[in-house]
Amino acid sequence: MLRSTVSKASLKICRHFHRESIPYDKTIKNLLLPKDTKVIFQGFTGKQGTFHASISQEYGTNVVGGTNPKKAGQTHLGQPVFASVKDAIKETGATASAIFVPPPIAAAAIKESIEAEIPLAVCITEGIPQHDMLYIAEMLQTQDKTRLVGPNCPGIINPATKVRIGIQPPKIFQAGKIGIISRSGTLTYEAVQQTTKTDLGQSLVIGMGGDAFPGTDFIDALKLFLEDETTEGIIMLGEIGGKAEIEAAQFLKEYNFSRSKPMPVASFIAGTVAGQMKGVRMGHSGAIVEGSGTDAESKKQALRDVGVAVVESPGYLGQALLDQFAKFK
C-alpha cells in the first residue's frame, strides 16, 4: 500500500483535480488510440492478464509484451516479458499499458507507469484503497506525460483502429460516430449495443470507472469528443454519488449547446431508487448519495436543463440519439 500525508484541503482539490487548467490536461489527447498504439500488460502472465491480452490480440490490438519481475526474459503469448514498464518501453516502444494486478499493489503499478512516462495507463483493478488513489491523483496533476483511465473500469476501446485495452466483449462493438463515457461497465455495454443496433456505431468508448478518484472523468472525455473529427454524438452514463454529472452538464451548456450546431448528447443516470437511501454505498466506492446534487434526479434534471436527452431506461439511448440528430440537423 502506498503511503502519503494528505490534508483535507488536498482531498478537496484531488476530487476535482483537473477542473482548472493544469499540466495533466495535456494528456487528454492520449485517449485517442490510433492504429499504431503499442500495448503492454502489467500482470501479463497472470490469469486475467493472459486471458484479456489474448482477446485483445485476436481483436487486432498490437500487444507487444508485458511485465512480471519474476519472469523477465521469458516469452508469453508470443511476446517478451520484462522486469519493469521502463524496460518494456525501451525495448518495444510501448505507448499504453493495461494494468491487471491485485488491489494491494495496483497503485504501485500505476505509479510505475507514471514514472516511466507511458502515454496511457488503463487500470482495470477494483478495490484499490482510496487513500492509495488519492496519492496517485496528486501524482497525476503535476505531470503532463501519462493519462490514466480507471481504476475499477472496463477500459477503453476504439472499434475503428481495433485497439482494445480492457475487458470489453469485442463482438458488440461497431466502428462509427458516437463517443461513449461511462461510470458503469455493464451500462457501457448496453449503450454500445444500442448504438450498434441503430447503426450509429462508436468512435471511442471510455469506461471511467466508479471509484471516487478516476484518472479520467466526464469533462475530460467531453473535451476530447467535442474536438474529435470522428465523433458526431455523445452518450454519457452516470450514477448516484458525487457531482461529476452536474459539472458535466454545465460544461456542455457552455461549450456544446451554445454552438450554432450542437453535438447530440444522450444520457442515462442509474440509481433513481437508491436516492432514497442516503449515506449507503451502492456498489462502486463513488456511488453514494451524500446530499443535494448527488442523487439521480438532481443529475437528470441538470442534464435536461442544458439540452441533453435524458432517458429513463438505457434501452432508449439509441433512439434518443437519433431524435437528437434529427433535431440538430
From Swiss-Prot:
EC number: 6.2.1.5
UniProt-annotated catalytic positions: 284 (tele-phosphohistidine intermediate)
Keywords attached to this entry: Ligase, Mitochondrion, Nucleotide-binding, Transit peptide, Tricarboxylic acid cycle
Pathway in which the depicted protein is active: Carbohydrate metabolism; tricarboxylic acid cycle; succinate from succinyl-CoA (ligase route): step 1/1
Pfam families (UniProt xref): CoA_binding, Ligase_CoA
InterPro entries, per the entry: Cit_synth/succinyl-CoA_lig_AS, Citrt_syn/SCS-alpha_CS, CoA-bd, CoA_lig_alpha, NAD(P)-bd_dom_sf, SUCC_ACL_C, Succinyl-CoA_synth-like
Induction: Induced during growth on nonfermentable carbon sources and repressed during growth on glucose.
Catalytic reactions of this protein: succinate + ATP + CoA = succinyl-CoA + ADP + phosphate
Residues engaged in binding substrate: 189
Compartment list: Mitochondrion
GO biological process: succinyl-CoA catabolic process; succinyl-CoA metabolic process; tricarboxylic acid cycle
Family: Belongs to the succinate/malate CoA ligase alpha subunit family.
Note: Present with 18400 molecules/cell in log phase SD medium.
Task of the protein: Succinyl-CoA synthetase functions in the citric acid cycle (TCA), coupling the hydrolysis of succinyl-CoA to the synthesis of ATP and thus represents the only step of substrate-level phosphorylation in the TCA. The alpha subunit of the enzyme binds the substrates coenzyme A and phosphate, while succinate binding and nucleotide specificity is provided by the beta subunit.
Protein name: Succinate--CoA ligase [ADP-forming] subunit alpha, mitochondrial
Encoding gene, per UniProt annotation: LSC1
